[in-house]
């Protein structure tokens, strides 16, 4: 059970870091319905 909890925490942490870096940098790909 503990392994599952630690795995979930690890994945969630990596996901948050990934999204933080992704949204911090300006998107190079132009959005189809963007401004």
Swiss-Prot record:
Signal peptide: none annotated. It is found in: Plastid, Chloroplast thylakoid membrane. GO terms for cellular component: chloroplast thylakoid membrane; photosystem II reaction center. Keywords: Chloroplast, Membrane, Photosynthesis, Photosystem II, Plastid, Thylakoid, Transmembrane, Transmembrane helix. SUPFAM superfamilies: Photosystem II reaction center protein T, PsbT (SSF161029). It is a single-pass membrane protein. InterPro entries: PSII_PsbT (IPR001743), PSII_PsbT_sf (IPR037268). One of its GO terms (biological process) is photosynthesis. Pfam families: PsbT (PF01405). The chain crosses the membrane at residues 3-23. PANTHER family: PHOTOSYSTEM II REACTION CENTER PROTEIN T, PTHR36411. Belongs to the PsbT family. PSII is composed of 1 copy each of membrane proteins PsbA, PsbB, PsbC, PsbD, PsbE, PsbF, PsbH, PsbI, PsbJ, PsbK, PsbL, PsbM, PsbT, PsbY, PsbZ, Psb30/Ycf12, at least 3 peripheral proteins of the oxygen-evolving complex and a large number of cofactors. It forms dimeric complexes. Found at the monomer-monomer interface of the photosystem II (PS II) dimer, plays a role in assembly and dimerization of PSII. PSII is a light-driven water plastoquinone oxidoreductase, using light energy to abstract electrons from H(2)O, generating a proton gradient subsequently used for ATP formation. This is Photosystem II reaction center protein T. It comes from Cedrus deodara (Deodar cedar). The lineage of its organism: Eukaryota, Viridiplantae, Streptophyta, Embryophyta, Tracheophyta. The gene is psbT.
């Amino acid at each position: 059970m503990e392994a599952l909890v630690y795995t979930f925490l690890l994945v969630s942490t990596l996901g948050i870091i990934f999204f933080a870096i992704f949204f911090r940098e300006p998107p190079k790909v132009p959005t189809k319905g963007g401004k």
